[in-house]
Amino acid sequence: MLDIIILILLLMGTLLGLKRGFILQFIRLTSFILSIAFAALFYKNVAPHLHWIPAPDFSAGQPALSFFTGNLEAAYYNAIAFIVLFIIAKILLRIIGSFLSIVAGIPVIKQINQMLGAVLGFLEVYLFTFVLLYVASVLPVDALQQMMGQSSLANVIINHTPYLSGLLQELWTQYGA
């Protein structure tokens, strides 16, 4: 079931990128990557201030989070800090990007603009899905963990995305370990 949802999301991203075109999609993808970079740089500064948020019980009775070897509570707060910073940066960059998107209205090489936009649309949704699945993998919710455990596509995205799979695991398990 999760595999079908992921495939639909990836198809929608591709079609949206096709509709938006390369220029607008490039602005959106760049803002997405910059938001991830911003969150990755500053989440360690924010995570220690989030302990007022109650952490779930990460006791042995919870579903196994097999690829995390570090402190799950630290990973939980790191994930929250990362997501909050990501959302803030994404909103600010989207506002800036909306001013730059005026360039996308110039009718220059429309088909190339659309095809390259489709590729970037796919990449944007893939990266978003990757981050969403990674955050979901930290949450000790039985139904969610079971759904993710049955999804071969989620497993491939989480564990085999070049560079990002190892990076997020390393980043999120460092603090407090």
Swiss-Prot record:
Pfam families: Colicin_V. Keywords: Cell membrane, Membrane, Transmembrane, Transmembrane helix. The chain crosses the membrane at residues 4-24, 33-53, 80-100, 115-135. It is found in: Cell membrane. It comes from the Bacteria. InterPro entries: Colicin-V_CvpA. GO terms for biological process: toxin biosynthetic process. One of its GO terms (cellular component) is plasma membrane. It is a multi-pass membrane protein. This is Uncharacterized transmembrane protein YshB. It comes from Bacillus subtilis (strain 168).
